[in-house]
Amino acid sequence: MKPTILLINFKDQQKLRKLKMALLPFKIRLKTVESQDYCQPIGYLAGVKEIAKVETASTEILSALIPQEQMEKEMLILAGITGNLFDQVLYTLRKAGTPVDYKAVLTEHNQNWNCMQLYKELEKEHQMYHP
């Protein structure tokens, strides 16, 4: 899998552009995830070959069950980015002035989750550390 950053729920196009420009030198795949794909496994969205796309009929059912309006904040998922590159990416995001409250790393544990499942988990963690 090529190092990838998934960009989810970015409504501010200027902020999204600034973030993409800041990350351009790293030659990392940046993928803006559209709301119709929020029910797909994040591993699939990041390009993990072993994770299959959810079928269309299932997608429509899941979309009905996942209220997108509940996703209020932006979310950034780092996949296949480790070590020094990971540190450099986070430093660059901070330096560029493009804060993203909800950040996650793709893991074996969460790669089968959809965007909303991960969002809810990050929301719980955020509330725990920032009451």
Where are these regions (language model features)?
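Mid-chain, well-packed structural core segment of small domains
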Residues: 63-96
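Short, structured active-site "lid" loops
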Residues: 45-73
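Structured loop/turn residues at secondary-structure junctions
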Residues: 10-11, 81, 110
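Low-complexity, flexible helical/coil segments
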Residues: 40-45, 67-72, 111-118
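N-terminal, charge-rich interaction modules
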Residues: 1-53
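Noncatalytic linker/hinge segments flanking ATPase motor cores
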Residues: 45-51, 77-79, 115-124
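Helix-rich interaction surfaces within compact, conserved domain-sized segments
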Residues: 4, 15-21, 25, 86-131
